[in-house]
Amino acid sequence: MASQFINLKSRLLNPYVVFAVWMLCTVWICITQSLAGPQNYNNFLVFRGVFDHLFSSLPLYEPYPLEYGDINHYGPIFAFIIAPFAVLPPWLGMSLWCMSLSLLLYWTVRQLPMPVVLTSLVLWLTLNDFYGACFKQQFNIAVAALVVGALAMIEKRREGWAALFIVIGTFVKIYGIVGLAFFFFVRRKGRFIGYMALWSAMALLLPLLFVSPEYLWSQYAAWAADIVQKNGENMFCAYTNISLVGCVRKISGSPAYSDLLIIVPAMVLFLLSYLRTGQYKHFSYRLTMLASLLLFIVLFSSGSEHSGYVIAALGMGIWWVNFPPPARGRLEWTLLLLALFASFSYNLLPTKFYRGVFVAYALRSLPFFAIWLHCIRRLWREDFAVTDVLLDYITLPAADEAANEAAESRPARPGDGLDIVCPCYNPAPGFVPALARSYAELCARYPDKRLHLIVVNDGSTDG
């Protein structure tokens, strides 16, 4: 039975299986939505309208009831992102848009320098919320992908791509600006700042090739006013403000206070984690920072919708896989199961309770808030040198780069690789964390060496 479970687990985490399931879900959405007709892909029609209206110099933030329901809330630069899909027949443009969102999120998660089985598990944990967001053609999928992609490109020292992802996310939906939180992890900061300035200038000036400056500046002003107005409308809206700030607002029933009373303390809690500068070098620390940012976007925004939880679910998935299995206790399992229950709540809860209580009071946010607090606690207290080793992040970035530079500057010589044999007979409690910490210290001390840790065990219980 145990071997069958292991075989099933290995098959489910196989990247080809994950990709096949991911794309089958996307294709199913494209087919069903196309056959259902335009009334089922209204969001895409709104996006398409941004392209048509900008190039006709029409207002971007006013209703067009003859074209679609709802109003656009994205920045003017979005017209250029949606352009390749807007010129196609609506059903085809919608299908390719969903396919592009799907591939973008899948690709960016796979770009994280993690073992393949871990990125596969992240995708599985995100799948249900991805399906809901893709069903509504939501740009939130791209927001999640751009934030993850920014860190992935920083890890690969591709500052230009990282800056581009942050600029696109910021100029389309503001949320992308959280990618700047990774600035302290950038090795070539001057290069990164230069690319940020370049891409920002292009995002601001590109529309001027097609519209007048007066029109463009008026639309940016209208966008700012729309964001403020939308924030007020979201306050007690049933199907928006599905966030922690919305939960507190709807339970209290009071419109008198500012959301900043909740957001500012949360920002302080998050920013305090930057004081642990010695942890910056550990990839698991940076991953925990990424998870907390993805959760923060949803938990502390009045614009959070159910489809926006693809961002929080991705954060939850990254939080989960960034745990060494021995560290997953009852608390961690409880938080994971509660978050998954919230994700499937539409199918699991009675309709009356779901709409009248669960949605009405934004209760979906609570397990994700608990996970965010868990991330903050880890950022404050954990020794991520141990986590890096236990999670097989063994080729630490600094050591890996130093070894590559050494290999380029001279031919490989005997002694570049070192085998460390560690007898392990009836180990004392705490042996594994101590061993991991020592190994991490050796990696830092000998960055030009390839260290291979060989643990010899006689089959004793704790080995």
Task: For the regions a language model picked out, list residue spans one by one.
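Short beta-strand/turn micro-motifs composed of small residues
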Residues: 422-424, 457
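Primarily membrane-embedded glycan-assembly and transfer machineries that use lipid-linked glycans
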Residues: 2-161, 186-309, 313, 384, ...
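Transmembrane helices and adjacent periplasmic/lumenal helix-loop junctions
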Residues: 166-184, 301-311
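A conserved acidic beta->alpha catalytic loop
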Residues: 457-463
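Non-catalytic membrane-proximal stalk/linker segments that position and tether the catalytic domains
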Residues: 390-414
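Short, well-formed alpha-helical segments that are part of the catalytic scaffolds
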Residues: 427-446
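Cell-envelope/extracellular polymer assembly enzymes that use nucleotide-activated donors
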Residues: 416-419, 452
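Aromatic-enriched
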Residues: 33, 320-398
